[in-house]
Amino acid sequence: MKKSNTTKALLIGLVLLSGIYSCKKNHPGPQQRFDIGQTNLVADTAGYGAAKIDPALKNAWGIAVNPNGVVWISANHSATSPVYDKTGATLRPPVTIPSVNAGDPGAPTGIVFNGSTDFGGNKFIFAGEDGVLTAWAGGNAAVKVADRSAAGAVYKGLAIATDGGASFLYAANFKGKKIAVFDSNFNLVTTKPFADTSIPADFGPFNIQNIAGMLYVTYAKLKGPENEDDEAGPGNGYVNVFRPDGTLVGRFASTGTLNSPWGITHAPAGFAAPFETILVGNFGDGRINVFSLQGIYIGQLQNNGQTIGIEGLWALDFLKSNATNTDPLFFTAGPHDESHGIFGSLKSTITTTGGSMGNSSGY
């Protein structure tokens, strides 16, 4: 990681921490309008206006990228990981994701890139709804590295972070209503609590994302009686911020416009607002909520005054993480009840209507 990026990440974390415990309000001034144009790069079938068709891209879910800009996607309903460049061009055959038994198809959701020699040197690691973690170091198939299927785990998201100089994986066990933590040898760790008793009992962690060294956890409502999928609806969502040791920093967002939130990312200044923001995507209604770094709600992404809604929206990722990133926002989606898949991008254009919008820390 470049020194400038590290410094920026630390500053973001400090801003977040200061905002959680302050009581100042947001003071809007003259504004600019940020119009967001959508481009569907790849879809699994015709009918979505995508330039490229890849039948493997069914229920496109998590996104991870290596330092060369190569994009890996979890295709949940084809049990594969298609690999593209930033234009959606296929770079290699999709990698097969196994389940509990090697010959059975997996159900990948979250995915992370591992740039270290930890985790057996595997470069891409996947979480699955079958309660299995799989990893890829080469070849045409990932391999199973952890199996919590017997305990009924349903992993919907995955993050990687360091704590005390050691690397860990963090999997959002939706059905189990907890964050499962694994060490660099894929052993389960039980000393990191990730607890918040103020979250209603019928909500579970839907996703987890590392932003500037903090772990953002989104929560969705469990759909009974199986409690394996979410129950979408206005206000059905929470977002918390935790340290990698599992201690709670604070509540970032609650109910309101949240609707089964899954995708979450840090946006550079000039994308959704003149200042840096946190974007939280709703799987429930496909809308993308915009917050200040301190959790102040700003609005939802729009284009020409119309709120953007991407059916089956999953991941949001700028692929590069810095304040001056010029990449568009990349997204994945599983439209038509997750039976199809889209990989696309969102690009911001600015219409000036005055100065910039002021922003101060606070909840």
Where are these regions (language model features)?
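Bacterial N-terminal signal peptides that target proteins for export
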Residues: 2-10
